[in-house]
Structures are given as C-alpha cells and as structure tokens.
Amino acid sequence: MKISWKNILLTLIPLGLISFLVWQGFNNTTNPQFTKNIASSRMTYGRFLEYLDLGWVKKVDLYDEGHTAIVEAIGPELGNRIQRIRVELPATAPELITKLRKANVDLDAHATNDSTPAWSLIGNLIFPILLIAGLAFLFRRSSNLPGGPGQAMNFGKSKARFQMEAKTGVTFNDVAGVDEAKEEFEEVVSFLKKPERFTAVGAKIPKGVLLVGPPGTGKTLLAKAIAGEAGVPFFSISGSEFVEMFVGVGASRVRDLFKKAKENSPCIVFIDEIDAVGRQRGTGIGGGNDEREQTLNQLLTEMDGFEGNTGIIIIAATNRVDVLDAALLRPGRFDRQVTVDVPDVKGRLEILNVHARNKKLDLSISLELIAKRTPGFSGADLANLLNEAAILTARRRKKQITISEIDASIDRVIAGMEGKALVDSKTKRLIAYHEVGHAIIGTLLKHHDPVQKVTLVPRGQAKGLTWFTPSEDQSLISRSQILARIMGALGGRAAEEVVFGLPEVTTGAGNDLQQVTSMARQMVTRFGMSNIGPLSLESQNSDPFLGRTMGSSSQYSEDIASRIDMQVRAIIQHCHTETVQIIKDNRVVIDKLVDLLIEKETIDGDEFRQIVGDFTSLPEKIDYKSQLKST
C-alpha cells in the first residue's frame, strides 16, 4: 500500500488540533488559579467597605496586581452564608490594606502568570490558521481534478455522462419483443449514419423521440442499444439530476448540457424519467414548483427555441406521459412518440430466447409454453423469471433448470415468496373451500378465463391462491366477461357461506370484495353498462399537485349518486345470488376437489377441469380475440 504524505498530513493536522485544544482545556481546569479566581456575584467597592466595617468580610484574595479582589463575606443580603464575591478595586487605595489588617481579615495576594497571555494568543490564532490552511489545501487539490480550479463550486455544470463512442454492451440484437419501437430507432440510427439517403428526398432528421410505456418494458434498454449502434457521441442523464437544492441550478445544467451537445453534434442526448422535470405547468396549489418550471422552460427553449439545435437528437423515456407538459410533447420537440407496451406471446418468446442464451435449460423445457403461461409479463418480469429459476436451480444443487424451477419462479414473480405449508386443520379446509369456490365458478362460466392452477401453498400475504390464464387481448372486455369475473371473485365467499354458514365466513374475501365493488362501479360510472344508461359519470381525477387545475372534475346530482349506489348494489347482489346457486348445485364435486387439494396441496388446471367434467358438462370458452378478427 502506497503511503501518501497528503493523507498523512490530512490525518495529523486534525489530530494535532484536537490534542492542543484538549491539552489547553485540561491545563486551564487543573490550574489552581483557575478555580480560585471564580465568584458567584459582583459587589461595588463602596459596598465592600461597608461590609468590611460591619465585620462581615472573612477573607480577601487579590489578583491582577491588586486591581481585582475575590471576597469571602457573610451577611443578611447573602442569605447568612459565606459567598465569594468579585470586587473591582480602584487604582489607588492605600488605606485598604490597613483596614483589612485592623479587621483581622485573612489577606492573600496572587502573582500573575506571565505565560498565560502567550498561550492564550497561540490558542486564539491556531484554529483560524489551521482552517485557512485546510481550505487552501482543498482548493489546491480541486485545481488538479479534471474539472480544473473551482471544481467544488461547479453546481451549475451538467451531470450528463458523455461517451464519444458509447460502449454499453447492448445492441439491437439484444432487444426483443418490441419490434415497432425497434424499427423506429433503427431508422434513427440510419439517419445518423447515412443522412444523405433521407435528405435526398427532403426529409429532416427527427428532433426528438419519446419512449412511453409501463415500467420494465425495455425503454432504457432501447436507449442503450441506440448508444451501442449509432456510432455518434452519446449523452445520458436522469431527469432528477437537473434540479437540486440551489435555485437556478436546473436551468444552468440544461444550458450546459446542450452547449456540450452542440459542440459534439451530431449526437444523441438521452433523458431517462423525463417526467421528473417535464411535468405539466399549471396553477396547482401555491403556483407550482417555480424552480422545476424554470428548468422545464429552459429545456423547451433548448429543444426548439430561437437558436435551434441542429444535429442533436433527444431521446427521452417515461411511464407517466399523462403528466407531461403539452409544450414538451408537440412536434418539433418530440416528433415521435413510441409506445413500448407489454409484449404479446410472440414478443415474450423472443425475449425469453434472448435471456435464455446463457442459461442451462433442460431439453424438456418449452420456451413457447412459458410464453403462453405468462400473459401480461414485461421484459423485466421475464428476465427476472429466468434469473429466479437459475438461482433456485443452484440452491437445489442441480445442473440444469427444469420445469419445476420455472413453475416455482412464475409463482414467486406473481405472488411472492413461498411460505410454510399449512397443517391439517379447520383453517386449511376453509381455505381449500374458498379457493375451490373461485376455481369452480371460473370453470363453469363460459365467459370466465380458464383456471391455470389452484394451490394451498402460502405465498406473500395469501394463504391460498387460484390462478387464471387471461386471454391475450385485454384491450376489449365485454359486459359478460366483467360479470363472470365478478362472480369468480365472489366464489370464495359463496363457498364459505354454503359450506360453513354465514356466522363462519371469514375476512379472507376482503380483497375479493374490493375488486368486485370496483368492477361493478366501473360498469355503472365508466362503461355505461347499467340501467342508468350509456353515461360516463366518472370524475376526471385532475390532481392539482401534478400541475393541473382544481376545477375540472365532473359533477352530478345526489339523485344520480343514489342511483349509482343502487345499481352497483344490484349488480353485486345478482352475481352473488347466481354464484351461491352454482356452489349449491355442484357441492359434491366441490367436496371431492377439496379433499384432493388438501391431499396434494396443488391441482393444475387440466386436472381440475377433468375432475369437474366427470360430474357436469363444461362450457366451451369463448375467444373474443378470434371473434373480433372474424368480424
């Protein structure tokens, strides 16, 4: 280990200062004069002479060459107990010594310590000297840093990471499942590499591309791929790095960022989580955040202001496009908005193929089957799924990832960590009836999603779980599907009521009832699926804290509000009645399924449907996606 004299100096100076201060304090407190030259109060010289004449003075100690006296006296004014009093003596008082001797007062004179002023002077000067020396040393060190002199005060400089040739290790080959977004950015890269092909027909390079989509869908990964493919200087910064505690820092950093970008154009500037600085300006409460709005105004000016920024492509990512300012979204700033959504089954298969490259998978594993089992999973979810499976494989000391680890990983990603298995008891049987109630309703309703698995293995906060496989296209949902989902959610509570009676129903259906109420209310207020008619009665939820105004929410009369509540109650009551009847009609198969579930703890969807099919006819599930395509 190399020893630096600078490090030694930085260590010894504070230690020396602390040691000196401790020594000086200890020296003062142990000095006898320090303790003697202390008084609880003061007294005038005239009053002191009166005390002396009355015989109340017991002892006098003279200090400062006879100019100060510490008097020990007693008297009614002092509470009839001896106290130490400080008295300032006049320069000429020759009669005082005579009076003290006549009164038989104990007198003592103390010599002045000549070394005290010198040490006091050193003690007063050493701290400022060391402070100035330390600051000079710090500024000297900062002058040797890449930023040059004054680096410590460069608050207004941009914190963007700059790469002349970005080496992110990510290319377009590593991006899968978002083909539309990928094509858009491949075109941007082509624009940078071969601009003449586009300018020949009068095309201009896009000034900005905004990536919009849910978390985990690959927005930042796309930006890394562009950086790796473009071959031009690349700046990357987070939206939260603009605004800090000093006023004006945000706007200054925006100016500095675009100044550097213009010096290195053509180039790409990537702003991640742009909603941190680009939220909509508005009234709000208290007029909004002036510092953030000042930063946003500067960003708008730099992106498409009077001077322009030819040769700079701005790429930004956000999952909160609804709160961005309208001026930021217009063409000329962000010419393109690319939606990076959750992948479909084809996209999920491509993503799984990418993340499975470095995984040792058993030959029996079908990535296509995994893709079909994971609707709604984002790219990050799928990457996490395979990583969890690999970790579980290593924990089990296996050489390859099998379908068992894949199943456990899917369950963990969806519902959380696996808990301890329940012991055989009334609680376990009640949970079994609850879960079978969900599953039997989902199986016997034509418009409900098919059952994927029923389990009593606790995960997260849930003691038991029932998985359904939703259809691939969830953008259009019919009224029959919503009613089927309401009945499926009520299946657990209905099974508890039928089997154990109303007094024995539990709180396990609390979350189910929240979902049921939410779906029924949306049917009435949002989708117009009730007797009130095709009306949208939902408030716009304009939040003033997001820069929106406070007076834009829709209003309706108390009569309509009462009718909404009645319709919600009627929908839920109707679904509950039908659900209870289905449970009663299929009590025999439910009892059999509960016994099997308690024995095996997990029943997959195919086995569940096969057992139910032995007792009753199963409806043919409707694929609304194929119906929509045929029309």
Swiss-Prot record:
Q: Where in the cell is it found?
A: Plastid, Chloroplast thylakoid membrane
Which residues constitute the signal peptide according to the record?
Answer: none
Question: Which ranges sit in the Lumenal compartment?
Answer: 24-118
Transmembrane segments annotated in the record for this chain: 3-23, 119-139
Q: Which GO terms describe its biological process?
A: protein catabolic process; proteolysis
GO terms for MF: ATP binding; ATP hydrolysis activity; ATP-dependent peptidase activity; metalloendopeptidase activity; zinc ion binding
Q: What is its EC number?
A: 3.4.24.-
Q: Which CDD domains match?
A: RecA-like_FtsH
Per UniProt, ATP binds at: G213, P214, P215, G216, T217, G218, K219, T220
User: Where does the protein principally reside?
Assistant: plastid
| Topological domains annotated Stromal | 1-2, 140-631
PROSITE patterns for the chain:
AAA
Query: Enzyme class, one word?
Result: hydrolase
Can you cite an annotated GO cellular component?
chloroplast thylakoid membrane
Binding-site residues, Zn(2+): H434, H438, D512
**How is the co-factor bound, per the entry?**
Binds 1 zinc ion per subunit.
Concerning PANTHER family, the annotation shows: ATP-DEPENDENT ZINC METALLOPROTEASE FTSH 2, CHLOROPLASTIC, METALLOPROTEASE M41 FTSH
What is annotated about its quaternary structure and interactions? Homohexamer.
This chain's protein is named ATP-dependent zinc metalloprotease FtsH
Q: Which organism is it from?
A: Guillardia theta (Cryptophyte)
